């Protein structure tokens, strides 16, 4: 029987409406992981979610006249293998934009 070494992994999921802010945040996270000698894999792009809202243009009549709005949620995943305590501290102190939603799973 071979012994499998359990490898620690941090999975970071990022979501944002603005793709450029999301990519900048991914670059900062990967750069921080590389500086602390951890291995970062990613950013792995996930499918973009589109939410479409249909609104009547007129407040009273003309149901045939409608307007469509949409929001696009861009998502990325970054995996960090063999993190040290220094890596986790550096990631906690990282200053990221407020428009980016971050989920960290250990």
Swiss-Prot record:
Belongs to the universal ribosomal protein uS10 family. It holds the Pfam family Ribosomal_S10. It comes from Parasynechococcus marenigrum (strain WH8102). InterPro entries: Ribosomal_uS10, Ribosomal_uS10_dom, Ribosomal_uS10_dom_sf. It comes from the Bacteria. HAMAP family: Ribosomal_uS10 (MF_00508). GO terms for cellular component: ribonucleoprotein complex; ribosome. GO terms for biological process: translation. Gene3D superfamilies: Ribosomal protein S10 domain. The keyword Electron transport does not apply. One of its GO terms (molecular function) is tRNA binding. PANTHER family: 30S RIBOSOMAL PROTEIN S10 FAMILY MEMBER. Keywords: Ribonucleoprotein, Ribosomal protein. The gene is rpsJ. Involved in the binding of tRNA to the ribosomes. This is Small ribosomal subunit protein uS10. Coiled coil: none annotated. Part of the 30S ribosomal subunit.
């Amino acid at each position: 029987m071979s012994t499998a070494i359990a490898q620690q992994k941090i999975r970071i999921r990022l979501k944002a409406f603005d793709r450029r802010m999301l990519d900048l945040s991914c670059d900062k996270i990967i750069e921080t992981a590389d500086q602390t000698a951890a291995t970062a894999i990613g950013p792995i792009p996930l499918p973009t979610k589109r939410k479409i809202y249909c609104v009547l243009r007129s407040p009273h009549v003309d149901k045939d006249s409608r307007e469509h709005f949409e929001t696009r949620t861009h998502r990325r995943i970054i995996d960090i293998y063999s993190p040290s305590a220094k890596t986790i501290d550096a990631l906690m102190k990282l200053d990221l934009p407020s428009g980016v939603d971050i989920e960290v799973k250990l």
